[in-house]
Amino acid sequence: MMTSCNDCKKLNENVIQDEEKVYDPEKMLVRLSVIEVYPEYLDEYLAAAATVGGESVKKEPGVICIYPSHLKSDKNQIRILEIYRDQEAYQSHIASEHFQTYKQGTLHMVKNLELVDMTPLDPSAMPYIFKK
């Protein structure tokens, strides 16, 4: 586990390392899930999203971040920032029991879902933000 930001070292422009992990920004999967939830299921959905996010980060070494939030102006509009070490970590995540429980349990709650793949502007800053 990384103990401080001082443990992070930028090895070169493409690889970031802390004492135990190496992340290749070219392989990382960064995604924004854009979700609209039916109002009558909002509380139930928010609880499920918070649970699966926390479990995933704790249990899966390749899950760097799952950070659900909602728009201030419309709580039914959910955004989830997802960051995975690589495609393999993402595939492992979506096959996990806790993700499948979340997915199957919330399908009827979701009015609309869009998955937007992103490219980080400064991947070298990630070790300073996410200390996993």
Per-region residue spans from a language model:
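Short amphipathic alpha-helical/adjacent loop interface patches that line ligand
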Residues: 49, 53
